[in-house]
């Protein structure tokens, strides 16, 4: 009985996972997932693994995937008072597929991280509201490092 329930549960979880094919060759731009999907986070994600480290206000994560699909929220914070937020990208390496890494403030994309980012620091002043870092991928073979201070 346990095996039947686990099998049904696994099948239900997998039905929510959608694979997005890379239909535009070497162009890394997203083809199916829109900015609106990223802002609303209205589609799920699969295939993205990570390791995380938190030391006080420092939050860092190393991500990698051979086949990342969907929209994944990497960081979320609600700033009640105007705050300065620093995002450090250690590296971003897209090997194949389509990928976008963005910073979202409330209901708009604040900034898109360049796909060739390497040891880049981005500082945003007077951030107030819901701040998120989101990744979107379509069959993306990608690895990247993100740190939020």
Task: Identify what each model region corresponds to.
Residues 1-4:
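Positively charged n-region of N-terminal signal peptides that target proteins for export
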Residues 13-16:
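C-terminal motif of bacterial Sec signal peptides marking the signal peptidase cleavage site
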Residues 19-78:
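Transition segment at domain starts
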Residues 82, 93-98, 137-141:
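Short proline/glycine-enriched turn/loop motifs at strand-loop junctions of beta-rich domains
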Residues 85-88, 123-141:
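Noncatalytic modules at the cell exterior or secretory-pathway interfaces
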Residues 95-111, 146-148:
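Short, surface-exposed beta-strand/strand-loop-strand elements in extracellular ectodomains
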Residues 118-122:
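Short strand-edge motifs at loop-to-beta-strand transitions and within beta-strands
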Residues 139-149:
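Exposed low-complexity, polar/acidic, P/S/T/G-rich flexible segments that act as propeptides
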